[in-house]
Swiss-Prot record:
The keyword RNA-binding applies. It comes from the Viruses. This is Non-structural protein NS2. GO terms for molecular function: RNA binding. It holds the Pfam family BTV_NS2. Keywords: RNA-binding. Residues 162-199, 228-268 are annotated as: Disordered. The keyword Transcription does not apply. Belongs to the orbivirus non-structural protein NS2 family. Residues 230-243, 250-260 have a biased composition (Acidic residues). Single-stranded RNA-binding protein.
Length: 357
């Protein structure tokens, strides 16, 4: 069931000092300055002494067709010497004089008490006489340069545009996060990632992604020995990793036992050593030819290998610049990105506090 539009009461106080309209004559006969026209659920028409709060005061010199324009609210009035017509609905068959509204802060007497109130003042000139037929036919198409008449009327055209908009395929908005992640990848990884996005989702996509990554890295670093199936080489790598972790742990314990006067406290934490050891044991093909090294408080690197999204706690954080290939210790804390860089034949793992591009 269609809901009826709610009507708001509008109070218009016509001020006709000359008494040329019916409103002015009634006000003079009652010795009052205003004639109130109330439009809403009910209609009222009476002379009054002063306007009410939030009312419209329409000052007119005589008969005319007046249209009060107050934002979304439009009030159309026909004031003649013998009658009054007013509406808040559309009334387009007649011409009207548009009257703008000026809000004013005033003091008026309301219900026997003087109160502060806002009234809206508007002044008409009487340049449009009542009931002048509007010569513009809304159904007639004017002759406009560069404009042709459509085969549809306005309602049909709006419905047609809406149907086309709803039936058109909607483009899926891509998330910004993959684009953001690609900024932290090296050229090889970004290329593989773009190729993987074109593949169909599912287990086959993951399998193809792994194969593509393996092929790209083998082409880029062909000089590395990729024979990883030999048992003796795997055992040798594991022993080297364990020796590196043991050396790092011994250095860390020696630094803690030494006094602060003789040796300053190191920024290498136990959590960092454990995280580095786990990364070394992953046997990443990009790091197989590099030996692990501990980063000093500041230094440089030769190239950025890759940046991974890893959440580490209580680790040294570095600010590094890819353009100058320098890094500097900032503090010890938590991070979400870890950069893998190389210096000579050493692998350095830097936790990113932030980076300058």
């Amino acid at each position: 069931m269609e809901q009826k539009q709610r009507r708001f009461t509008k109070n218009i106080f016509v001020l006709d000092a000359n008494g040329k309209t019916l409103c002015g004559r009634i006000a003079k006969l009652s010795s009052q300055p205003y004639c109130q026209i109330k439009i809403g659920r009910v209609i009222a028409f009476k002379p009054v002494k002063n306007p009410e709060p939030k009312g419209y005061v329409l000052n007119v010199p005589g008969p005319g067709a007046y249209r009060i324009q107050d934002g979304q609210d439009i009030i159309s009035l026909m004031l003649t010497p013998h009658g009054v017509e007013a509406t808040t609905e559309r009334w387009e068959e007649w011409k009207f004089e548009g009257v703008s509204v000026t809000p004013m802060a005033t003091r008026v007497q309301h219900n026997g008490v003087m109160v502060d109130a806002e009234i809206k003042y508007c002044k008409g000139m009487g340049i449009v006489q009542p009931y002048m037929r509007n010569d513009f036919d809304r159904n007639e198409m004017p002759d406009l340069p560069g404009v042709m008449r459509s085969n549809y009327d306005v309602r049909e055209l709006r419905q047609k545009i809406q149907n086309e908009r709803e039936s058109a395929p909607r483009l899926q908005v891509q998330s910004v996060s993959p684009r953001e992640e690609s900024r932290w990848m090296d050229d090889d990884e970004a290329k593989v990632d773009e190729e993987a996005k074109e593949m169909i989702p599912g287990p086959s996509r993951l399998k193809k992604l792994r194969e593509a990554r393996s092929n790209v890295f083998k082409e880029v670093e062909a000089e590395i020995n990729w024979n990883l199936d030999e048992k003796d080489e795997e055992d040798r790598d594991e022993r080297e990793d364990e020796e590196q972790v043991k050396t790092l742990s011994d250095d860390d314990e020696q630094g803690e036992d030494a006094s602060d006067d003789e040796h300053p406290k190191t920024h290498i934490t136990k959590e960092y050593i454990e995280k580095v050891a786990k990364q070394i044991k992953l046997k990443d093909e990009r790091f197989m030819s590099l030996s692990s090294a501990m980063p000093p408080a500041s230094g440089g690197f030769d190239r950025m290998i890759v940046t991974k999204k890893l959440k580490w706690q209580n680790v040294p954080l570095y600010c590094f610049d890819e353009s100058s290939k320098r890094y500097e210790l900032q503090c010890v804390g938590a991070c979400e990105r870890v950069a893998f860089v190389s210096k000579d034949m050493s692998l350095i793992i830097l936790r990113s506090a932030f980076r300058r591009l």
